[in-house]
Amino acid sequence: MSSVFTVKIVGPAGAGIKSGGLLLSRILLSHGQHLIDYSEYPSLVRGGHNTYQVSFSHQPVSSIHYQLSLLISLEPNHWQLHKTELTKKSLVFGPDAPLVLPLSDLVKPIGGHIYANTVALGVIAYCFGFDPSICHSEIINTFSLDSPNLTAFDAGFQYAQNNFIQYQDIFKIHSNAPVKRALIVDGSEAFGHGFLVGGGNFYAAYPMTPSTGLLHFLAQKQLTHPITVLHPEDEISSASLAVGAAFAGARAAVGTSGGGFALMNETVSFCGVANLGVVFYLASRPGPATGLPTWTAQGDLLHAVFSGHGEFNKIVLTPGTHAESYQAAIEALNLAARFDVPVIVLTDKLLAESSASFTPPTYIPKVVSSPRHLPGSDDSFYMANSYEHDQNGFSIEDASLVKKVVTARLSLSKKIVKYLPKPVFYGSDQAKTLILTWGSTKMAVLEALNMLDNPSKIGLLHFPSLWPINPNWALMFKPFKNILVIENNATSQLSTLLASAFPFKPTSTLLNCDGRPIYPEQIVKYLKPYVS
């Protein structure tokens, strides 16, 4: 198993923790490291306690880790909140930390506390043996050739050299050549790249954490891509605009989080009856109501699957990694176009806002389209009617005709199942215990399996789509003695969903409902009885 290092920067909001962390990630990428990051922040503009952490290795790393290699606090009274994450080997720097770092004194001649985050990067670079010239290049690319951040970085590096010489290169990284074409993207940006490659040309959204990043990303792309991005007055308007765009022939999507998606439910139903393919990007956060606006959870699975009133076809995709988020955007657009149904891409704050090293595929994906009755066409006629209707859109109420139309509509689900991404198995054929996951929890489980001394006893089955359910999935569980479900909610919604389709009862579940991710260290501990 390769060494995975985790660095965490903490302090108050407004201290540039996220921007400093992303600069650190770019430095890591330039040293050939694979990485994934995670940030926490309260729902405050200033104040509170913010964090940024990044786990990295010279080999692929799937998830952030809980235990820290190095922790830097930009102000007093912050590092103490993370004592449970420290080990005997952890280094802790800060104004009041075990390894005193007088940031206020170091930044005074540079221009103030705004540069404390870059001073901290200098200390990190010293401890990991980063190439200062590479660090300088990344700082220049991020800011400018004459940026005070260069002076700030050197001040941190020099202070560490003078005061922490015993920690020089204490963490031995394997520097690789930078991965060609590699990017640092969060889950929403990965989805956005896939959306553009897949021919998406209309996006509407009202800002709502944690989906807002996709709105910002695609809005910027209007300058270079044939896409229209709108920010209307609320979520209902956003969904309605996307539906109108789809009716006019666009490959359209709309984005939101749980409370916003609740407002869009009538539109989901309208898409289902009017045969309009729209993609809904649903980035979950803890609920109910406002819940925990800036934290993470997987509590909206059943909400997505059973969204809308009445009975109609819909598709729910559940990507688990940045690469899957990219692919899910392409698949969602194609499925919406092929079957003219609403497609919900369900992610969460952890995946949507965490960045990772990612290399976009070089292939050009196939763009699937279906015959459309476009408004204004001389050779076709169709009404997108919210009433039950016949094939031309005319309202109907005759009992026999209604039954025929409803039966024909719902029968499409058998065909849809054949086009959905299939469950993916990871592990040995000798495994007797099977873990089931969906969404971002896959990342932590994969990392945990890599940390086990005897991983051959454990297999992982990940579901990149969860609706419609293929009843044949039940056959995949038969070879295993133990079935474990791991997900980031309180009630094991995956278990409930599977049990609605066929007899299903897991051996055990590992659940989390505190707004934080499930970490691989938790999973390793949970799996001990099954690998001993």
Predicted regions and their residues:
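Thiamine diphosphate
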Residues: 1-15, 22, 32, 141-306, ...
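Conserved thiamine diphosphate
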Residues: 71-73, 122, 295-342, 531
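Short alpha-helices
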Residues: 96-141, 489, 493
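Cofactor-/ligand-binding subdomain signature composed of acidic, glycine-rich
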Residues: 115-121, 132-173, 369-396
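Flexible, low-complexity linker and terminal segments
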Residues: 177, 184-198, 328, 333-532
